[in-house]
Amino acid sequence: MVPVIALVGRPNVGKSTLFNRLTRTRDAIVGDLSGLTRDRQYGEAKWQGRSYILIDTGGISGDEHGMDEKMAEQSLLAIEEADVVLFLVDAKAGFTAADQMIAEHLRKRNKRSHVVANKVDNIDPEMARAEFAPLGMGHAIPIAGAHGRGITQLLEAALSDFPRDDDEPAEGEEEEVVAEGEEAKRIPGPSEKDGIKIAIIGRPNVGKSTLVNRMLGEDRVIVYDQPGTTRDSIYIPFERNDEKYTLIDTAGVRKRGKIHEEVEKFSVVKTLQAIKDANVVIFVMDAREGVVDHDLNLLGFALEAGRALVIAINKWDGMTPSERDFVKVELQRRLFFVDFADIHFISALHGTGVGNLYASVQNSFKSAVTRWPTSRLTQILEDAVSEHQPPMVNSRRIKLRYAHLGGANPPIIVIHGNQIEKVPKSYVRYLENTYRRVLKLVGTPIRIEFKGGENPYEGNKNTLTDRQVNKKRRLMSHNKKASKKRRDKK
């Protein structure tokens, strides 16, 4: 499971600066979800093959109401959700009573915590450690967040005990390559043992709990509750038609007979973790509310993670034909960026259309993990280039030479060529659509990556040998004499 790190501390100790520096290591910054969180900011980052979720909390003022109200509003939830807490203090301001109050609270929570002495510019790190020793939380880690000093040591302390990403090859290992002429196949993995992992996500009150209970209904063969490795997510293995599945339920434990949707406490962290751990994401929307910005934010999470996607429009029953037509138009207009995903109109409460989700889950998963040989992908590339060539750049045609598979779930197709940095986005979309159509991919995003060919002689000065210099002089002399003879004849 992806570890969660929370940044806590007084106002203006540099939490946001550190947050920005850490999340800048990846292009995907989750940012604020207006309306879902109050003063907390969520981001994703990666360090030495380890992905992690970062939470930036608002400052804890430390006044008579600060510890109660502020901590209850934002920092308390962040601490509860976190695997590691980074307690930031200001080395320039020194030890304060508010720091002591925060330290006491962290000790009561029994959370793995590190004191981080920020702003050690022009300050002796050893003096900073001694300054905050009375907190009783071990040696402080000195950093200068604004300049990036000490960040490596900080991340080593926070993340060294967590495993590398499952899909990240360990150092010295190479990714499996499909040999020439080999048939496309599914590569067995953890999902083969536990079944397809399905994360059901969506805004509060759209029917996630109802859908979970409906999918685990009377026709189930095997079902049991098993607490997952996160604080609230529940992993529920079950079978349907001899196929194994595991539901990742972020809505919490509920009684089996209780199928009405309760008002849920939305947790961005639980959703992010469920998406990361899933093979397929079922995204639930409320047909009566249509597409809202929060839906687009959550879809963005799933897209960034590259997970296969199925969209379920819930509460479809009871809507008039005109209302249904309006919703379909809105879906087509606002969800154009996930047009690869199957859309199902369901009623989780009554079970209408729920059974159809399984076929889409199976097809999406198969598309996401199938592998193809290099010869197949290269042939598709050659056909695409033949039908529609890349544009000219500085009077030179962009050359795309061959393609191979770079990863699965999502499929990553690596294309080698020249001037690849100048391939326009429109042509990238053309290639994505071509591969999707020819390979018949459904329900999964696809990523195109380019690699340029290295010129081994680039930067080398062309030095001629003495023999080559003499030969060049003879040729130049011969050309001059020939030119003179031609002029004399005229």
UniProtKB/Swiss-Prot annotation:
GO terms for biological process: ribosome biogenesis. Residues 3-166, 196-369 form the EngA-type G domain. GO terms for molecular function: GTP binding; ribosome binding. GTP 2 binds at residues 202-209, 249-253, 314-317. SUPFAM superfamilies: P-loop containing nucleoside triphosphate hydrolases. Gene3D superfamilies: 3.30.300.20, P-loop containing nucleotide triphosphate hydrolases. Residues 470-490 have a biased composition (Basic residues). It comes from Pseudomonas fluorescens (strain Pf0-1). Associates with the 50S ribosomal subunit. Keywords: GTP-binding, Nucleotide-binding, Repeat, Ribosome biogenesis. NCBIfam families: GTPase_EngA, small_GTP. This is GTPase Der. InterPro entries: G_ENGA, GTP-bd, GTPase_Der, KH_dom-like, KH_dom-like_a/b, P-loop_NTPase, Small_GTP-bd. It comes from the Bacteria. Residues 370-454 form the KH-like domain. GTP 1 binds at residues 9-16, 56-60, 118-121. HAMAP family: GTPase_Der. Belongs to the TRAFAC class TrmE-Era-EngA-EngB-Septin-like GTPase superfamily. EngA (Der) GTPase family.
